[in-house]
Structures are given as C-alpha cells and as structure tokens.
Amino acid sequence: MSLIATVGPTGGVKNRLNIVDFVKNEKFFTLYVRSLELLQAKEQHDYSSFFQLAGIHGLPFTEWAKERPSMNLYKAGYCTHGQVLFPTWHRTYLSVLEQILQGAAIEVAKKFTSNQTDWVQAAQDLRQPYWDWGFELMPPDEVIKNEEVNITNYDGKKISVKNPILRYHFHPIDPSFKPYGDFATWRTTVRNPDRNRREDIPGLIKKMRLEEGQIREKTYNMLKFNDAWERFSNHGISDDQHANSLESVHDDIHVMVGYGKIEGHMDHPFFAAFDPIFWLHHTNVDRLLSLWKAINPDVWVTSGRNRDGTMGIAPNAQINSETPLEPFYQSGDKVWTSASLADTARLGYSYPDFDKLVGGTKELIRDAIDDLIDERYGSKPSSGARNTAFDLLADFKGITKEHKEDLKMYDWTIHVAFKKFELKESFSLLFYFASDGGDYDQENCFVGSINAFRGTAPETCANCQDNENLIQEGFIHLNHYLARDLESFEPQDVHKFLKEKGLSYKLYSRGDKPLTSLSVKIEGRPLHLPPGEHRPKYDHTQARVVFDDVAVHVIN
C-alpha cells in the first residue's frame, strides 16, 4: 500500500502546454517557478520533495512512499528501460509529479493578496509543460540559459528570482552517490560538462543547432513507421524494424543534454530525473505516445521480457499490460497497470493537439493527428534546388496532399547495432558525409547520431553484467539529406552518391576503447503510398537493398 495514491491533478481534464507558450503565461509560469522552489526546498526525506520524486527513477534505490517496506528488493531504480513498459511506466511517473506540483501551486496561489481567486483557478488548471524537441529543439532561455527569471510576486509586483528550472541543488548530496565519481561531489545538477567538470551551455546550444534537423526527422519516422507496440515502445532489437523507437529518440535527448566531455546528470539513468529539464523532456515523450496512440487506435501494450531488473519488477520477468507499475497505486493496494493508461483523461490531462477532436470518432482523430504529424514533423528536405526527389519526398511526408497514383520510393537509412553495455558508460556515434579523415566537422557534413543512454556504473553492477550482450539498434534516415543532391532515390543513384561522398563516424566516449560490437549497414527499403492514403507503407513484395561495398570509415 502506498502512502501517496497516484490520482493525477484535480479540477478536470486540462492541457499540458508547450513550454514555448507556457513561459509567456504569467500565472502558469509564476506558479510553476514558485512550486518548483517549494518542492526543491523540502527536506530530502519527504516523499513529496523534488529529491524523493526524482529518486523514484534511479538513486538512492529506496522504496517510495510505502506503508510497509518490502523484503529482498532488487537494488535498482523503479524506472523501466529497454522493454515494453517504458512509455506507460513513465506516464504514471509524470502523473504523480504533476499532482504534487499542483498541490504546491494551490498552496502558493493562496499567498497572493490580490486576485487570489484567479490565482487559485490558475493553480487548479496547472499541468506540467512539455518541451517539443521534435519541432523546435532549442527550448526557451528560461529552460536553458537564464540564471534568474521574472515572475509576479504575491503583492502583484514583478520580481526576479533564481531559476529553479535550470538546476537542482542537493541538500545534502546523498550518500548513495558515493560510488559514482563526479556525481558524489557536484552540489547541483550539471548539463553538458566540460573536462574541468564545469557546465558548458554554449557547447550544448551548438549541439542543439547541429542536431535539430535529424531529431525532427527521427520523430517523424518514429511516429509514422512503427505500427507495432514492440517496435514503437523501446530501443531493443525487434523484427522488421525500420525506424527508431520512442525510447531511442528519447535517449538522444538525454545524451545530448547530459553528455559533454564527461557525463552529466541527464546522461545517467540513475541521476537524470534530478535535472528539472527531465520533466519537460518526458512530458513530450508522453505527448508523442498520445499522438502515436491516436494514429494506432487499436494497438496498446504487448507482452515482453524485463531484461533489466527494477525495484518493482524482477530481472528477466515476463511483463504485459497487466504488470503492476510500481510504486504507483490508484488507491489502497490497487496498483496502476498499463491496461488502464491508454486514456489520459483518467489522469486529468490532455494536449492542445486534441483540442478540436474531443468526442470525435477514432477514424476522425486518426486522420487529424496524421495530418498534424505531417505538418509539424514532416519537414521539407534540406535547402537546395527543387528536384524530382524533393517533390517525391514532399508527397510521402504529406507536405503536398494530392496524389492520384501509388507512389513508390526507397527509404534509405544507416542501420546501427551494438552491445549497449560494452563500453561501461554512455556514448555517442556521430555520422558525417566525409571520406576517411575528411573535413567532417562542418554543419553541412553532419548526418546524424545514435546514442547509448546507460551511464557509468560500478564494476559490481549486477544488472550490467547480466545484460552485457544486450543489443541496441538505431536508424539515421538519409532521404532528407539525399534530396538536396540527387534526382532520385533509386539504388543505383544513391550507391554512386555514397561511394563518391563517403561516410564516416566518430565515437564519443570517455575512454579510448573501440566499439567492437558495432554493426553499420546502409539499407534501402521500398515504400509505397497508395492513392488517398496518409501513411506510407513498406512494400514487402520487394527486397530491401543493402550496400555491402560502401565503406563507413572511423574518424579517430
């Protein structure tokens, strides 16, 4: 039985807002800042403190809000990664944060001496905002830069306060952090640290500008080309996989924000939730789950295996839509399960994407969200002269709406696979259009990245040893870039281009060991888009094309 039931915020179904709009809303932003201040200032043993809420995800590996402690717990966080419960466990996780945040906001609102009724109403309407990195990777300055933010004080006057969205201050550093190097000495969360262990925000902004196009491309393909739960939900190997999973794209954001020259908090699963940006990030992950569910209305959680042990699920346990999502209880001894989580209204929230669709049929909602995905994430190909390939790609992404014939196109990807735990830390693989040793670091050479979000763990990490052969895969989609130089996506044209242009990759990690398990393939899969259809389909009557003779060089 839990001491805190997970029921979501009160006051009916309200929208979680894009952080870009949220920071412009005086009342919401003021209440959010003040509420974070309140939760972050609480004693770290308080179950409703920011520290305890963040600690559910990873360290300090203690039970959260349990009336009676369990025996023989598996020493890990509660979070589920690399398995089919990844999206739904995090849905309940966000909900408990949101309800406690709203409670703090109501407490804050009652301190206002003027227009108190309006402030209390705003607090009741407050929901956790999201960072739509698939559309606009650079968040507002209030999230990434500003040491102080402007809010409205209790007397109605404007004031400047320290920004609680930028970092969390540990008070104190928890003893459980001791085996984890720099994390045992950093007094605050740190993003993109340099070799001197200092936060490097200019470097992070540079990375965001570089990766924005490929993150949008991955988001689009993830939503459009994964129609089975096992392929959509997590970054493990799945049969007939053609696009990155929701978790894989999620991993990219964690590593981008957290990993600089060394690991920062967002880059390590045990520490990530202590960074306030984690909650903006994961709220968008949940929003993408809602979009995907809308265009796949009859698909939900399937069965699988929990490779990694968690505090709530034993290692290698069979899991499915009825698996208890510890430590989140609806009431008494009734634990939330994925089967109850398809409808976000049960938890008191929605997203603006669905504003005009309430009460609509599932077919109407599916088509409307399909169009929204095309418009928001189906970005036009990179700048260049308009050509046949450009027009064809625009048709497939719904940028042009009218097509009367069955359109056909090859979908070209760099298909990457590796042992996730081989290097004992998080790492990144960055790919470039460049020959071996070529001029690879210019923006127009960058193609994309694949990231392993796993963090450094002590040598005694049983979970790491149990999963040392666990394979992770990822995809970098090339058509977006090929369209600026080629007239077609036919194999002979793409093959000639890649042979002449060259492909290289660079491994970014703290050590100097090579990634010996790495497999890189250039693949083309035939697509077709039937007349009047919104969603491209893979043409299984034709074989995929694999270029075995296109060398992918290593940049040292």
Curated annotation (Swiss-Prot):
Propeptide: 379-556
GO biological process: melanin biosynthetic process
Reaction(s) this enzyme catalyzes, per UniProt: 2 L-dopa + O2 = 2 L-dopaquinone + 2 H2O; L-tyrosine + O2 = L-dopaquinone + H2O
Function: Copper-containing oxidase that catalyzes both the o-hydroxylation of monophenols and the subsequent oxidation of the resulting o-diphenols into reactive o-quinones, which evolve spontaneously to produce intermediates, which associate in dark brown pigments. Involved in the initial step of melanin synthesis. Melanins constitute a mechanism of defense and resistance to stress such as UV radiations, free radicals, gamma rays, dehydratation and extreme temperatures, and contribute to the fungal cell-wall resistance against hydrolytic enzymes in avoiding cellular lysis.
Protein name (database record): Polyphenol oxidase 2
EC number: 1.14.18.1
Post-translational modification remark: The C-ter is probably cleaved after Gly-378 since the mature active protein is smaller than the protein encoded by the gene.
Organism for this UniProt entry: Agaricus bisporus
Enzyme class, spelled out: oxidoreductase
Binding site for substrate: 254
